[in-house]
Amino acid sequence: MGLGDVYKRQGLRDKNMVKKLEHKDLLKAGVHFGHLTRKWNPKMSEYIFMENNGIHIIDLHKTIECAYTAAASLQNIAKSGRKIMFVATKKQAKTYVSEKAKELNMPYVTERWLGGMLTNFSTIRKSLKKLSALENLQNQDTYTQDFSKKERLMMSRDKDKLEKALGGISTLNRIPAALFVVDVNHEEIAVQEAKKLNIPVYGMVDTNSDPNSIDFEIPSNDDSFTSVSTIIDYVSAAIAEGLKEREKIKEEIRIKQEKEASEKEAKEKKEAEKKAKDSKKEVTK
């Protein structure tokens, strides 16, 4: 039983959870269009509604339920303060996904996945430190005076190279709590690395995918921009709600601590006044 099944069995329903996707919106976005029937993966059979003109049609009722389950789990991860890494290196998804990840302050990979990005994170972290050091150097007022034109050019090239490969995870100081991938086939290496480290994987699975390769599958068209953006918008809204809840909890804790500190101070002041008053009585006896 996968993590998704556990959440389904628990029947997670959060009053602050985003609403379920609308069937009509998914139809309009073309989320239901799968691949040619000859390219299908038999393991997707439970998510296929029918065949039409040689193309498999995805059961959108299943999409809605799976998306809700995945979104509820992602919301809880965000609420706990942990990081969710978005992975989308496909041309039609990379720009939109990177924009959404930036809005959420979540790490993302939209260029080539570097082998060992998760399983050899200690090495990746060294590269991130180098990137940070180069950025700090370039921001110094004496940068042009301290380095020759040739040195600055070399450092600029190094920085650009690192920025392109690792810019999306530049603030990541530890392995993420979860991955969200747009196409499990296209991001196979990322999925494999996550599985080795027992990191739960969420993602879009088309009719040519193996839904069992990840923990929270969302049956959907992973090739169309409108389909990808619709699913990304939905899970992003859930993550944003989780972050909002986290900030609310932190604020409630802050207010509670201030109240307790104020009450403690008032109590100590009252005790001190009582002690002073008692001492005065002793003196006057």
Task: Label every model-predicted segment.
Residues 5-24, 241-285:
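Intrinsically disordered, compositionally biased charged tails
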